[in-house]
Amino acid sequence: MSRVVVVGAGLGGLAAAARLAAGGHEVTVLEQAPDVGGKLAVERWRGYSFDTGPSLLTMPDVLSELFEATGGPPAGLRLERLETACRYTFGDGTVLDLPGRREEIPAALDAALGPGRGAQWADLLARAERMWHVVREPFLESPITAATLPAMVSSGVGLAEVAPWLSLRAYGARSLRDPRLVMLLDRYATYTGSDPRRAPSPLVTVPFAEQEYGSWYVPGGLGEIARAVRERAETLGARVHTGVRVARIEQADGRVRGVVTSDGERMRADVVVANADAASVYGMLDGEAPLRTRLATAAARFRVGLATPSLGGFVLLLALEGLPEELRGVHHRVLFAEDYDGEFDAIFPSLGARAVGTLGRAGGRLAGPPGGARGPSARVGVAAIGRPRPVRRWAGGQQRPGRQRQPAGAVRLRGGPQPGARCPGARFRGGRRPAAQRSAWPLPL
């Protein structure tokens, strides 16, 4: 039996804790936020509830396998498959209700966008499926190391299917000739805050997985998943502590020996599992290690520093009443801008945060079935996406008090029924910046 410290109680950390505890190890989980789940969080306000992170579950079998491996299905966690995954409204007024089952999608595309569109999308998904079978095991089900990467590309077939030299947009162009289908594919690049014209082709496996395995929701919010996994880990003997920040991961004799919290408490460990941002983890590693290890850590830290940060969208969490019946049954609604490329052009060359598009025309999302006793809650994601900016002080994080100290901004609503109307951020409970932006005070440009 080993003593294990898990740093971070996001879903990955909680799942690792549950599996390790089921294997008989002594497990302690340390989370700096007041609650577990990381981005998988639910905001509750006056009878309303909002998913503040992911709002869909794909590949539910992965979750089922976790619970089966650690004791069986949990009580009180119910998954619902969405019959309509998303309602898309394009700039030309076309409305597409995308089914939640892959076999129904071609007919829906033909009906909404015109004959032949379903065949174009089906061809794309068939290619994406072949890529999925190449990348799933090495990238999703195995540790990625220098030894495992060559195995994936050892055959010309695997390399050709992945086509890493193509962008997501270029990969899709081989199948898609309707610009609205191109928009549909491009949207999946925004899942990672990326430009589809630069994002790597393997992102095409995201729509494949979503449409092959279905779009699922958890009544009460996806945060219920984090609650259930925490309960499973604790039932198996793991100890979960929130509000505890790890300041340092100690090393000695060429291996980790434990962690030190920001309060100075030292916790010994045979193994440390880090469910945290890579840059943070490399920053936690202390210098008490052999020269070779320190050099490798420094090199890894340097490589992480060169990575391009992803982007996030400005999100409003709105408690809505009196919604039309046709909107109540739609879990997600995306409103595409008339010039979708214009959004990406405005975002990526800029060095500063800037608004892109408007509420009436920009990409947005209305998410959430009835979430509270007083009516449905909704999350509207506005295409107001900003590039990272220099900061003068880091404070707070995903669920820390720092987010409350952000100066209230204003969103101008153009093209709506009230021209010139302003929505000060301080007046909307739940109005959010992306997590990375909420954790810093920006420097003036």
Give the role of each language-model region.
Residues 45-49, 192-193, 214, 302-305, ...:
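A short glycine/serine-rich beta->alpha loop
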Residues 91-199:
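Rossmann-like flavin
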Residues 163-164, 175-179, 197-203, 214, ...:
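C-terminal lid/capping helical subdomain adjacent to the catalytic/cofactor pocket in oxidative enzymes
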